[in-house]
Amino acid sequence: MRVLVFGAGVIGCELAHLCYQAGNSVTLLARGAWADVLERRGLVIRHALQMRTTTDRVHVIRQLSPENRYDMIFVVMQQTQVPAVLPTLAANVSPRVVLVGNNMQASACEQEILDACPSKEVAFGFFMAAGHRESERVVSMHLNPKLICGPLDAKTKPLSDAMRERVASAIGAKSMQDEHSMDAYLKCHAVSVLPIVYLCFAHDYDLTKVSFGETREGLAATCEAYRMYRELGIALRPDGEDEALDNECKGLALPMFAVYKTFVGRLVASDHCSNAPGEMWALDEAFEQLRASAEGYTGSFEVWDKLRSAAVARFAEAHPGWKAPTGS
């Protein structure tokens, strides 16, 4: 099967590796010096926890032409970069697209593609891995990499059997995890990571400086957001998040605090925040807009606002001239 991974950051490279290992003909869309490295050395990934290095000889392109047909396209880009590539995806003849990664405007992205090409199948995904990119390799952090994948909402528009089978064939059936409501999943993921993002910004991307009390506050902030979601009728996804809210996320603070104190916290959180602050603030802005639209909700965001205010203040201090997103 011909698979294109559109975007060659850490997640895109790890996803391309999975597709390659599944026996597909894999192409990576990359640009600049990194594209040169991929052509010269292949896709080199250091799997940190597994203490092994893999090299995959993938194809490399620098742009996607309308006539370049692939059985599956995975778009793996920062949320702020996705809108610019939607016209290219809509104009391309490939029949299936999966948008992978943070996306608080998933519905609008899908609609733009379908307005231009109603026959195209669109799904959404989130890839469970992290890491950073060095000059000639990727350092990846994962236990058992999974692509959480599905439609925005299966109740209104389920994923077709053909689309699901193609995704599973692309990455390997064992690496796919079905999700029936990716819109809710992505919204829940955003509010689970934003408090961590705020702590990263407040402590200059050094999570080892985070106190145990702040760790507990981060979880409490997520619970505040979850309560609003529940009242708005937004499902808490994935499975287990309803129970986590009912238990006030008890039992999670200590393991999370331990992660903050190790290199794992840097690879799964700090690195991404430092490399993509624009995407993090875009997530923040999207959530603040969602909060503002929930006019009848009167629940507390005391802890959330405390963490966010500290992050805004420190980021503004470190970046003179920066303006905080709407809602500050």
Which residues make up each language-model segment?
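Rossmann-fold dinucleotide-binding core
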Residues: 105-189
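Helix-loop-beta segment of a Rossmann-like dinucleotide-binding subdomain
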Residues: 138-148, 200-210, 263-274
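Rossmann-like NAD(P)(H) cofactor-binding subdomain of soluble oxidoreductases
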Residues: 52-139
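NAD(P)+-binding Rossmann beta1-loop-alpha1 motif at the extreme N-terminus of oxidoreductases
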Residues: 1-51
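Active-site-proximal catalytic alpha-helix in oxidoreductases
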Residues: 181-226
